[in-house]
Amino acid sequence: MAPPVRPGMLPLLLLLLLPPLGSVPGVWSFSELFFMKEPQDATVTRKDPVFLDCQAHGEGPIKVTWLKNGAKLSENKRIQVLSNGSLYISEAEGRRGEQSDEGFYQCLAVNKYGAILSQKAHLTLSTISAFEVHPVSTEVPEGGVARFSCKISSTPPAVITWEFNRTALPMTMDSRVTALPSGVLQIYDAGPEDAGKYRCVAATHAHKRKSMEASLTIVPANETRSFYMPTIIASPQNVTASLHQTVVLECMATGYPKPIISWSRLDHKSIDVFNTRVLGNGNLIISDVKLQHAGVYVCRATTPGTRNFTVAMATLTVLAPPSFVEWPESLTRPRAGTARFVCQAEGIPSPKMSWLKNGRRIHSNGRIKMYNSKLVINQIIPEDDAIYQCMAENSQGSVLSRARLTVVMSEDRPSAPYNVHAETMSSSAILLAWERPLYNSDKVIAYSVHYMKAEGLNNEEYQVVLGNDTTHYIIDDLEPDSNYTFYIVAYMPMGASQMSDHVTQNTLEDVPLRPPEISLTSRSPTDILISWLPIPAKYRRGQVVLYRLSFRLSTENSIQVVELPGTVHEYLLEGLEPDSVYLVRITAATRVGLGESSVWTSHRTPKATSVKAPKSPELHLEPLNCTTISVRWLQDTEDPAAIRGYKLFYKEEGQQEHGPIFLDTGDLLYTLSGLDPRRKYHVRLLAYNNLEDGYQADQTVSTPGCVSVRDRMVPPPPPPHHLYAKANTSSSIFLHWRRPAFTTAQVINYTIRCNPVGLQNASLVLYLQTSETHMLVQGLEPNTKYEFAVRLHVDQLSSPWSPVVYHTTLPEAPTGPPVGVKVTLIEDDTALVSWKPPDGPETVVTRYTILYASRKAWIAGEWQVLHREGAITMALLENLVAGNVYIVKISASNEVGEGPFPNSVELAVLPKDASESNQRPKRLDSSDAKVYSGYYHLDQKSMTGIAVGVGIALTCILICVLILIYRSKARKSSASKTTQSGTQPLSRASASVAAGSDMGKNLERATENEESSVPMMPSCFIDAKGGTDLIINSYGPIIKNNPKKKWRFFQDTKKIKVEQTQRRITQTVCFYQPGTTVLISDEDSPSSPGQTTSFPRPFGPTTLDTEHSANSEGSHETGDSGRFSHESNDEIHLSSVISSTPPTSNSLTCGDSDGDAAPKKHGDPAQPLPAEQTSAPQPTPAGLRHAAESVPV
């Protein structure tokens, strides 16, 4: 919870901008409202008229009303308020119940600035009582001393005189006879003339009373007197007097010779000689008593000429009415500020301080607090603009002082937040939400949330200040099952809004904070009566609906449970074993659940043979204060067993037992003192006789904390500050805070509150105590966010909670290894390892460690280590050596620690052939893949992905081919324009083709470094079932309108006759120039049959370039961009040549320029060619076939 702040500091700038209040007319007018005359104490006789003065002065109009004993006094014919404000009572009535006029009167003066209340005036009627003490007859020897006294109560104090034989004694007599104002008559050196009857007369201005008579008898003395020590027969008595009264301290002594009486002060101060005198033979009279006269006076009777003396002492207490030593000062404060009035008074006895607002008493509650002599008003509102009075009163009178609070309002202040509503979240938290002010909401810089208990008086109001970016707040640290009142205030730089509407919300119930305190007694050897008191409301936290009793024999482990309704407070266990120790405990439950169980309380059942044993007493325990417990008991009057006494035992919970304390049979009360505050004590009591101990009674009780009334009025100390939290482990957090510099107290204790964020059950909140400014909080959940707060305790006072600090515990170290570890060889020397995070949703991984090594390195303990971040679940293992088997294992870790390694995974790297040791490693072909398929860890998901990808790629290629074919039909008409006739004979082309046989060898060498992934297809199967009429050269596709045609590559038009009726292909030549594609059929020739046709040469001369780009050392041609780069060894470059190698049995050939036969379609007749057009058939090189298959369209 945010700390309580003082929002009154927010608009402090406003005070600097305000004009001097003295320049504002009428602002200080309230100072004119004061009393010129106030009512004074008065004593009158019944039926006498009464005048009580009250004259107020100030800005008119001024209205004066009267209060009697704090209530408004109604006017009638007998009681009237005069025009000057005085009260007139025509005939005083007394001692007739409500008709009595006796009491305390005050006048209240009101004008437009406020109201002030006068001091109290006590009106009493003159009365006199009967004599409380009458003179007593006495007999003294001649020459001795005689003393008579009487006592009477009256209002006003009566004047007492004496009569001798019904004749008044003069007020001033010789030194032998002294009449004291207190009602004492002293006679020294009594003689026969003093014998007679004496009585006292008490008189006031309205009454007179006479006491009974007392006789003085003088006995003749012996002729000779013996010496005897001085004796004080009437010592001074303690006296309490008011200021300006007269005090008499009597001191009368006898002895022989006659003692000398002297006075002194016990504090060795000198006695005031101006107001003090000795009356008679040693009585001290102090007139016009003042405070400095108070003290202890010592009367000393000394035998003359000796050191023999005797003393007597008495204390003089002087009472004084209250008087101010510090007066409250008028204040001017802005809206929502804080006002503090200070008022100090002194008097004897100490005056009681109270505060008035416009004449009405203020009660400390919510935002208005009274601490001893201070009045603090928080969150000032316009209604706080008033006149405040500090009243100090004691038995001697009352006095008041006034001050004005002026509230300055800002015209541009925001309106109040509205639509405030509260929602209960848990037993200790309530969600408060509101809407922004409708007016000037854009200028709001902060909100303050105020809350306090809705029931009771003197409730503390708490305040939390929030930023302007939120309109809701969760108030926690509330008491369960309690009503709270909330309101909101909005702040801006120049002031604050009015308070929002108040809302009240109740927290949920919670489990009881502590169990009931039980009492155990036995009525027979086989039963135990269990009784308990209801849990106090502050610990109950709801309505108790169930009690659960658990009991067992101390020698057994089985527990028996009895559940009782919440309205039951005792239960009798019957059928128990005699002379056995039973353990009993109790648990209380609300509607939420069961609370904490009490500790096991032991009780021994009586012996079965204890027929004459005394019954158990009825025990009652009551804490008198924080260190004392009153133990009371009653014995059964019907118990026939004799009782010799009682034995009392007690112990603090968890400590060793004290006792027995032996008590007499007449003792029914004992006080245990010297206990510790806030401790639970177990007390047991039993009666005993000469035979044995009786049945015992057991009961537990808790001592309260030592908090006095004076302490309750002291403001609470500030909370600890700079609270700091740091996670230590996954189950502990270290806290550190600073002690506030508010006191020099040496003993300070702290309470730490700890709970997970969002906790719904307040009973799960952890409270820890320490006297240090740091603590390691243990037993927390891993990877959980907690909130912490600290409060301090000093001199039985507790501070508010410090601001809440949030911190998260560290996660646990991974308890399991990564799962699903897979290793895939993706290159000859590179493998891909993948895995999944360890099982468990709470596992947090920040790093993975990959260890891998060959078998030899593994045996030597030499691992290669890789690290990956926690979000990465794959890694590449590079620079693997062929022919080795590698061991791979992975572990997960975080900032707390390292997890375990799983079982190792092995990877075999494909060995190389000796013939290929100096070449690049080859990829596995299909047959090799079967042999080493065991080393490929491809799961079903991987295979499915590959198949889907290949299918998509083939579909795209097919769509592209269809699009090209469709678009080529529109461009057939342009083919004739792009084809040029050639004049060179076919022999030149044949020669060029023949020259390509040498280059075919180079091509074969080039293809040795290429991968072979699919079986080769001869070029004659390129279009086995016919094709389209598409002709492509370097200028683009050539489209012919002839729907029936045959494709030829480089046809010899000089010697081959085209016969359309037979549709026979006379010659087909396969040729590919990198970067150039030319497809020609015999029907597509632009020349007539027999005409020589010349094709353009896109690159270089007419001779075919059969050099493979991968193995070419150079070119005799002026190379161009049609060739692939000679520097790239990773690409596959293809060329089409016509081979002159003799055919083999495994080779498939197409017709060429020198072949004897050409392949025929089904149904075409054979047609021999001229000899000059044939040549030895050449097998197609594998590389050439591959290239032919790989030519893009």
Curated annotation (Swiss-Prot):
InterPro entries for the chain: FN3_dom, FN3_sf, Ig-like_dom, Ig-like_dom_sf, Ig-like_fold, Ig_I-set, Ig_sub, Ig_sub2
GO molecular function, one term: identical protein binding
Residues carrying covalently attached carbohydrate according to the record: 84, 238, 625
Extent of Basic and acidic residues compositional bias: 1105-1133
Cystine pairings recorded for this chain: 54-107, 150-200, 251-299, 343-390
Cleavable signal peptide: 1-23
Region named Disordered: 974-1018, 1078-1193
Main location group: membrane
A Pfam family matched in the record: Ig_3
Domain Ig-like: 24-124, 126-217, 230-317, 322-406
Keyword Cell membrane: no
Biased composition (Polar residues): 978-990, 1086-1095, 1136-1150
Cytoplasmic side: 966-1193
Annotated keywords: Developmental protein, Disulfide bond, Glycoprotein, Immunoglobulin domain, Membrane, Repeat, Signal, Transmembrane, Transmembrane helix
Membrane topology: Single-pass membrane protein
GO cellular component terms given for this protein: plasma membrane
Transmembrane segments: 945-965
Role played: May play a role in anteroposterior axis elongation.
Protein name as annotated: Protogenin
Organism: Rattus norvegicus
Gene that produces this protein: Prtg
